[in-house]
Amino acid sequence: MTNNHRRPLSFLVLLALFGFGAALVGQAPPIDWQRVETESMEHFQAVLRFDTSDPPGNERQAAEYLKQVLEREGIATKVFELEPNRLNVVARLQGSGRKRPLLLMGHTDTVNVDPAKWTYPPFSATRNGGYVYGRGTVDDKDNVTAALMTMLLLKRSGVALDRDVIFLAEAGEEGTTRVGIQFMAQQHFAEIDAEYCLAEGGSVLRSEGRVQYASVQTAEKIPHGVLLTASGTAGHGSVPLETNSILKLAQAVATVATWKPPIQLNDTTRTYFTRLAAISPPAEAARYRAVIGNDAKAAQDAVDYFAKAKPSLASSVRSSISPNIIQGGYRVNVIPSEAKATLDVRLISGQDPEAFLNEVRRVVNDSSIRVEWIPRDVRPATPSARLDSEVFKVLESAFARHYDTAVLPTMSTGATDMAYLRAKGMQCYGVGPAVDAEDGPKGFGAHSDQERILETELHKFVRFHYEVVRDLARAQ
């Protein structure tokens, strides 16, 4: 009788121990975030040290480095190349297929540099005073590094995935998209096809060291170029003429630059101003509410105020024009017969381009001035990403957890490669690390001559990025 009792008890103890041990075997140890920070910095500095200025781009070395790191971890990786040295890297972690994939996208090229204007060499990835300095630190090798670390950490964790997670390090975002996202979207879309995409375009805004809010890019304006060509009468500079082409052009440029296209709001901008008003001092909040209110004059007054005090806000609610190039004349004593101006036009998505061009002609109101589009790398017009999606909800939760702040959807006045993916029906969201509002005016922001990022904010963003992707992709 005693033996009969011992056997079941021993069996249960062994079973319990076996089950507990099996659980330990199947469960990855907790992530050592200090080690992750060291590894993240190693990869970040490595990709920063590759000169991928575009033009010419030459992303090969950066792409090969990323490929090597991913493959060393046992992650399947492919390379796609339209032109020599313009490489796009695609890697994939397989999920169960219960949900459609999630794409993590970043670009390895950067804008050009004038080394003479940099305190630290722009491709040295110098660390000083808690910052990392270098071209690409906040556009966009921070996102590339975060996506890379997310892939590595997901692989090491062994977490079961309900969806594939795809990594895309693309070439050519800074002006040569034909070798990057256009090439991938048109010829290799099956390799990157996903339900959702996380890419650049957002940030956590800090002011005087304190977090103000998090921005998630859910829409963007569409870039176009307009050429004004004024024709006049040539002559001697000693006899001023009213038909001087430069005079005509100057008047046209001044007229069109001060024109105020109508205010146009979408889901993104309405929600942005609503949420911004909720966290702003009373006087500012009143202006933000006026923009989305029913009083047209109050809305226009608010936008006029923004045009002087916060130009980016004014640009976010209407199609915009900025005269950026003027050409005319070849010597001081000759009145030229022709002069030209190039206008940078950013259309609100949904604006009819031809209707807008006709409006420019109406505003110029001079038959001697030709108004036409100029060839440009025009991204497709696309609707805003949804604000009620699974991704946006997970982002809101993660920003609250990591930064204790509100999330504002934003419409970028600039352009990103997400436009090509949104045109394919993908829901795309732009995120990024915390940046100081003071950095831009001081010359420390993206595309500046002292581009930099706080080391602590890079590390915080890597952890944030990983947890967002984990929560979106892991098996439920």
Show which residues each predicted segment covers.
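Acidic/His- and Gly-rich active-site-bordering loop/insert found
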Residues: A28-T137, V144, L154-R163, L343
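Metal-dependent amide/peptide-bond hydrolase catalytic core
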Residues: Q27-A28, G202-Q212, V216-K460, Y466-Q476
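Short pre-catalytic strand/loop immediately N-terminal to key active-site residues, enriched for Gly-Thr
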Residues: N128-D139, V407-L408, S448-Q450
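Bacterial N-terminal signal peptides
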Residues: S10-A23
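N-terminal secretory signal peptides that target proteins for export/translocation
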Residues: M1-R7
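Stable alpha-helical elements in mature extracytoplasmic
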Residues: V36-F44, E59-A62, L66, D140-N143, ...
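Acidic/histidine-rich catalytic neighborhood of metal-dependent amide-processing enzymes
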Residues: Y131-V132, V138-S215
